[in-house]
Each structure stands twice: as C-alpha cells, then as structure tokens.
C-alpha cells in the first residue's frame, strides 16, 4: 500500500540479491526489496535438504536468478519461503 510492504504481505517478484552464510545454519539474505533478513536454515527439513547439515556444503551457496542454491543448483529454496521464514536484520 503506497509503496509500503507490511509484515503480513509478501512483495511481488521477490528475489534474493545476495546470501551470506554464517555459523549454525544461519544466513543473512539481501532481498530485491532492499531488506536484509536473517534466515535460520534449520527450518529446511526433509531428505532434499539433508546435505545442508554439512557446514562446508551449507556455506558453499550461490544466488542464481534470484534464488539461493547449493550443490551446483541441485538444492534450492524459493525466495518467498526464505522471506516468510526470516527476520528483519539490522546490521
């Protein structure tokens, strides 16, 4: 509404511009909205995400076409999901 995104609303055409992996499966994400948000990747469960438990694999992420990917794009996570499950980060 009037260029303001409220907490209950997801921005349209959301993309991730950068991802900075931290310890303990946390990462700082920069979204196309300009927001930086803290994402706890332990919410990524199931066999598809099991390799991310290896810290070396988790920290070797790349952003491809606005999506965070791992293992040469074999694993990815939708920007909308990461936005909904992250918290505002104030550096």
Regions found by a protein language model. Name each.
Residues 1-91:
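Motif-centric detector for short Cys/His coordination patterns
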């Amino acid at each position: 509404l009037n260029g303001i995104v409220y907490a209950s609303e997801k921005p349209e055409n959301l993309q991730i511009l950068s991802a900075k992996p931290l310890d303990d499966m946390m990462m700082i994400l920069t979204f196309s909205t300009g927001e930086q948000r803290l994402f706890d990747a332990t919410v990524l469960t199931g066999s598809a995400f099991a390799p991310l438990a290896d810290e070396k694999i988790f920290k070797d992420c790349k952003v491809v076409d606005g999506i965070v990917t791992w293992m040469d794009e074999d694993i990815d996570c939708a920007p909308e999901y990461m936005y909904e499950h992250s918290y505002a980060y104030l550096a």
